[in-house]
Each structure stands twice: as structure tokens, then as C-alpha cells.
Amino acid sequence: MKKLRRWFKSTSNRTFIVWPIVLFAVEAIQGGMPRLNLWALPLLPWGYLQYHWVGAYRTKLGGGGPGLSNPPERIVEAGIYRWMRNPMYLGHIVFFVGLALVLESWLAAAVLAFHLVWFDLRARGDEKHLAQLFGDPYRDYCKRVKRWIPFVY
């Protein structure tokens, strides 16, 4: 039971496995097999691969693990981190956008809206933690690099 609880606690397991199963099941129960918009399907592997590749990249350059439960040893400012501070979370968001578009579902859109807010709040909390960990060098990085959209936000 402890392993299962830990598995469900993983944000990536919930994003890439649990939510798609739940949303497909709810859509199927409500009205049979949902009509899928296949043109949006590439967003699903894009979001998944972005999360995993950026996580491996950050771990390679910064040490630690892909999440803050095993925090980095160094600030990573190279690659995609030169343009945005939270590309791993953005991978989750791209996946949820893809899921909402593929399913063309109000429920999937509501799940996306919830996660837009949730990941923004989580990123802000992570950034406070990293500022405590790395001090002024991290605060300077935050002044130079936007949270989500390069040069904008």
C-alpha cells in the first residue's frame, strides 16, 4: 500500500497515466467512446518527452533528481533553462493542452485550467526554495529568465 501511495504521489504518474485514464473513462461512460481530434495528438508525446528529457538534462547538469525532493546542486542556466525557468512543468502543461484538445472535453479543459494554476503555484514555491538554497545567484537568474514564456512571463 505504501508503494502505491508513493506511486500516486508522483506528479508525472498522475499527469501522464492517471489523468488520461480517468478522462477517457469518464468520456466513455458519459457518451461512449469519445471522438478524438487526432490533429492534436502530437502534443501528448511532446509534453511527455519534454518533461523527461528536460528532467534528465537538468539532473545531468545540476545534479540531484528531476524534482525538488532531491534538489539540484547547481543552478542550470544552459539549454532551455536559458529561456525559461520551468520547462519540466511546461511539459506537463503541453500534455494537458493536448489531452483537452484531443478529447474536446469540458472536463479535460477544466483539468487543464486547474493544472495551469496548480503548476504556477508550485513553480512559485519551488522558486522560493531554490532562492533559499542558492541565494543571490538564483535571484539574479530569475531576473534574467522568465518563468514560463521567454521574454514575456
Named regions from a protein language model:
Residues 1-81, 90-153:
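Membrane-anchoring alpha-helices and their flanking helix-loop junctions
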Residues 86:
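Extended, alpha-helix-rich binding/interface surfaces that flank or overlap catalytic cores
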